[in-house]
């Protein structure tokens, strides 16, 4: 490979490079750390989307670096490790796409390609399906309505709703199954505010309906 494109650096040149770019690299790493640490859907959807882009780029960048290491390995041991890491990275990257496509088929939501989690919370509010990622496999989900603003697990979904608009069932879609949560408790705090608790009641191989249906038996369709 042409050394003019990939020049060989000695230790002094590397130290000089770090001295010149140390401040910029520090700022970039600080921003990335803050975004990864505080990027949650319950805080800022914009910051969370940036976080998802950063996480999404990590695997292809890793694959590029491992392939690069295969061409510039220090010895045969490093070459073998670089090839192994390249294979592992590519396999995991392919599995990510396979699982994301399967989840997309189940939900029809682009949140299926979220690199952080394969759990998607789905709630039908007056015929409009909201889909948002949830990090953990919760046994209960909490829906809160505050002066018409709807929140699920602290994540704001929309406005103009009342407690009466809350459905009887909420689902969490996974790659393998669809978990159904049934409303077990509802408490009205005032005219426009209150909350409801949904408890996991059913797990099966289902997909979300493409349109609103009446009744739970028709709302869950076999995949």
UniProtKB/Swiss-Prot annotation:
Q: Which residues lie on this side of the membrane: Intravirion?
A: 42-51, 102-223
PROSITE patterns, alphabetically?
COV_M
Q: Superkingdom, according to UniProt?
A: Viruses
Per the record, membrane topology reads: Multi-pass membrane protein
Show which residues sit on the Virion surface side of the membrane.
1-20, 73-80
Presence of keyword Transferase: no
Localization recorded for this chain is: Virion membrane; Host Golgi apparatus membrane
The UniProt entry, under CDD domains, shows: HCoV-like_M (cd21568)
User: Could you tell me which InterPro entries the record lists for this protein?
Assistant: M_CoV, M_HCoV-like
In alphabetical order, the GO MF annotations are: structural constituent of virion
Q: What else is known?
A: Isolate N2 belongs to genotype B.
- Role, per record: Component of the viral envelope that plays a central role in virus morphogenesis and assembly via its interactions with other viral proteins.
Quaternary organization:
Homomultimer. Interacts with envelope E protein in the budding compartment of the host cell, which is located between endoplasmic reticulum and the Golgi complex. Forms a complex with HE and S proteins. Interacts with nucleocapsid N protein. This interaction probably participates in RNA packaging into the virus.
Q: What is this protein called?
A: Membrane protein
Q: Which organism is it from?
A: Human coronavirus HKU1 (isolate N2) (HCoV-HKU1)
Name of the gene: M
């Amino acid at each position: 490979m042409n050394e003019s494109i990939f020049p060989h650096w000695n230790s002094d040149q590397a130290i000089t490079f770090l001295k010149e770019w140390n401040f910029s690299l520090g700022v970039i790493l600080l921003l990335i750390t803050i975004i990864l640490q505080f990027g949650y859907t319950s805080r800022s959807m914009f910051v969370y989307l940036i976080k998802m882009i950063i996480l999404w780029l990590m695997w292809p960048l890793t694959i590029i670096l491992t392939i690069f290491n295969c061409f510039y390995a220090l010895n045969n041991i490093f070459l073998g490790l670089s090839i192994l890491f390249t294979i592992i990275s590519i396999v995991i990257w392919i599995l990510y796409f396979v699982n994301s496509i399967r989840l997309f088929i189940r939900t029809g939501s682009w949140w299926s390609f979220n690199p952080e989690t394969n759990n998607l919370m789905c709630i039908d509010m007056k015929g409009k399906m909201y889909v948002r990622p949830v990090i953990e496999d919760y046994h209960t989900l909490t829906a809160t309505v505050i002066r018409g603003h709807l929140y699920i697990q602290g994540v704001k979904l929309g406005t103009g709703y009342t407690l009466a608009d809350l459905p009887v069932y909420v689902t969490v879609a996974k790659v393998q199954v669809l978990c159904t949560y049934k409303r077990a408790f509802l408490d009205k705090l005032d005219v426009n505010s209150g909350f409801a608790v949904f408890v996991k009641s059913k797990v099966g191989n289902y997909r979300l309906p493409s349109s609103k249906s009446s009744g739970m038996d028709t709302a869950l369709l076999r995949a």
